[in-house]
C-alpha cells in the first residue's frame, strides 16, 4: 500500500459514499493533489504505521520497545512521525494543547528523529500535508464504522493542523 493509493482508493470511496458530509470534496482534493505533487520524491522505508503510546513498551522509566506490527508496510518515511504527532492531538480532549504547545511537541519529536537521521527539506515541507492526509484517513475510517463523532473529531484535528502549517514547516 501507499498513502497516495489509499487516499485515491478506499478513502475517496468512503467519503463519496458519505456524500462529503464531514469534509468537503474540495478540501479532500486539494490535500490529495498536494500529496501527489511530492509523494514520489519522498524517501520510502519500512514503517510501523500505528505509532502511538498504546503500542510503546516501557521499562525502568524508559522506552524499551514497541508492539503491534500488523499494519507495518513500506511507505513514506515521515508517515510514522506524522501519525504519532497527529495522535497526540486525537488523544487530547477539550483542546488540551494550545497551538504553541503542540508546535513545541512537533519540534521535539522532529529534533529527536533528526538526532538519528536527518529529514530532507522535501520531507519537512511535506509533514503538514501528510498529517492532514492522516486525519482524512481517520475521517473516512470512522465514517465507514458509523462513528460520526470521531469522524468529526478527526475533521477538527485536520483544521487544527491546517492552522499550524507554517509553524510546522519552520520546525
Enumerate the predicted regions with their spans.
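ATP/Mg2+ or Mg2+-diphosphate-binding catalytic cores
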Residues: 138-171
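Residue-level preference for long, well-ordered alpha-helices that form the structural scaffold
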Residues: 17-20, 24, 98, 102, ...
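Active-site catalytic-loop/activation-segment of kinase and kinase-like phosphoryl-transfer enzymes
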Residues: 1-37
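All-alpha amphipathic helical-bundle segments outside canonical DNA-binding/catalytic cores
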Residues: 119-131
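Active-site activation/catalytic loop segments of kinase-like enzymes and analogous catalytic loops
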Residues: 78-117, 134-149
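Conserved ATP-binding subdomain of kinase catalytic cores across diverse folds
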Residues: 1, 115-118, 122
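Hydrophobic core segments within long, regular secondary-structure runs in both alpha-
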Residues: 29-32, 103-110, 158-165
Amino acid at each position: 500500500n501507499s498513502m497516495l493509493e489509499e487516499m485515491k482508493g478506499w478513502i475517496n470511496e468512503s467519503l463519496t459514499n458519505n456524500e462529503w458530509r464531514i469534509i468537503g470534496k474540495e478540501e479532500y482534493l486539494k490535500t490529495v493533489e498536494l500529496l501527489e505533487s511530492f509523494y514520489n520524491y519522498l524517501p520510502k522505508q519500512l514503517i510501523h504505521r500505528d505509532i502511538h503510546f498504546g503500542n510503546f513498551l516501557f521499562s525502568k522509566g524508559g522506552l524499551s520497545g514497541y508492539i503491534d506490527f500488523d499494519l507495518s508496510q513500506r511507505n513514506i518515511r515521515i508517515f510514522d512521525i506524522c501519525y504519532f504527532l497527529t495522535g497526540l492531538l486525537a488523544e487530547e480532549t477539550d483542546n488540551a494543547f494550545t497551538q504553541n504547545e503542540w508546535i513545541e511537541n512537533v519540534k521535539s519529536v522532529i529534533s529527536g528523529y533528526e538526532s538519528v537521521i536527518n529529514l530532507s527539506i522535501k520531507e519537512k515541507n511535506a509533514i503538514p500535508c501528510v498529517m492532514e492526509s492522516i486525519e482524512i484517513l481517520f475521517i473516512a475510517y470512522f465514517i465507514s464504522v458509523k462513528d460520526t463523532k470521531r469522524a468529526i473529531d478527526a475533521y477538527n484535528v485536520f483544521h487544527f493542523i491546517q492552522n499550524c502549517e507554517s509553524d510546522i514547516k519552520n520546525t
